[in-house]
Amino acid sequence: MRNGLLQVLTVVCTSLVVGCAVPSAETQGLSTPDGALFLTIDLQVDPERVEEFLAVMLDAAPDTRAREGCRLFDIYVDQDNPGHVVFYEIWDSREQQEAYLGWRQETGFNARIGPYMVPGGGGLTYFNKVDG
């Protein structure tokens, strides 16, 4: 029952995330826009609490996407390890993304999602686009 519910939730979450992301003309291609910041946040979520975590994140996603500088915010779940969740984000600048993270900290959101995390798992990585 739990695995079936998780599979349904994963499909629904994937559909919602893709359906909610309204790309600008610049991000409709398959490439990160020049000058934009691309990052991933790699998380390990308690396998017993993945469904709850995704519900909280999907509820918060519209606020994230509405932040100044956010071009794209998607959530992905590992097909073979549902506790492995990755956020894929594109921002106009690192400063805007860091201001967003500060806002989430100030509002208590990070403390709210902390109990879902597996200690020592995850990380945030900023990437530069290499043209060539």
Feature map (PLM): residue ranges:
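Bacterial N-terminal signal peptides that target proteins for export
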Residues: 1-10
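Solvent-exposed beta-strand sheet faces enriched in polar/charged residues
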Residues: 76, 125-127
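C-terminal motif of bacterial Sec signal peptides marking the signal peptidase cleavage site
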Residues: 17-19
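An amphipathic, aromatic/His-enriched active-site/gating alpha helix that lines ligand/cofactor pockets
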Residues: 9, 21-23, 29-32, 62-71, ...
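Short amphipathic alpha-helical/adjacent loop interface patches that line ligand
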Residues: 57, 61
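Short, surface-exposed ligand-recognition loops at beta-strand->loop->(often short) alpha-helix junctions
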Residues: 44-53
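Short, solvent-exposed mixed-charge patches
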Residues: 131-132
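Short, well-ordered beta-strand segments in beta-rich or mixed alpha/beta enzyme
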Residues: 37-44, 74-101
